[in-house]
Amino acid sequence: DLFERHGAPVEEKHFPGKESQSMEQALDEIVKKLELGEEQFETAAVVLRTENEAKKAAHILKEKLQAAGFDTENRFSYLHRDSASFCKGLTVTTFYLAKGLEFDQVFSLFPKADRSTLSRQGRYIAATRALHKLHMYEYGK
C-alpha cells in the first residue's frame, strides 16, 4: 500500500476486454455504486487519466444517469481546464485537475495497460481525493 486509509475498504476491480467496451462496463458499475443523495454523500468524482477519456466518460455517464432519473442539470459537472466552477453532486475530471480537491466518494478509472510513471502518479492523486469511499477501477487488456 502506498499510504494508510481510514474508512470503508477500497474496492479494486478490473473490467477486461476492448477499451471502449470495458470502459462502458466500468461506467455502468459507477452508476450502480454511486452514493449521492439526502441520506448519502454530497460529492463524488470519477477521476480519469486524460481530458479525452474524461470527456468521453462524462458524455456516457450523463446519458446513463439521465436515464436513471438522476438530476444531471444541477448535480453533474464535467470539470475541464476551462471550467470556472463545478457543483455538488458528481464531478467527472482528470487526475491533474482533481489535485487539491476532495470528494466523499471517488471512482478512479484508468486503462490497465498504462503502467507509466505518470499513470501511477495519476492513480495516487485519484486515490488521495477520497474522504470516505474509494473505488479503484481499471479497464481494457
Residues covered by each model-derived region:
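Inter-lobe coupling/hinge region of RecA-like P-loop helicase motors
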Residues: 1-29, 36-48, 90
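Core RecA-like ATPase module of SF1/SF2 helicases and allied nucleic-acid translocases
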Residues: 3, 35-141
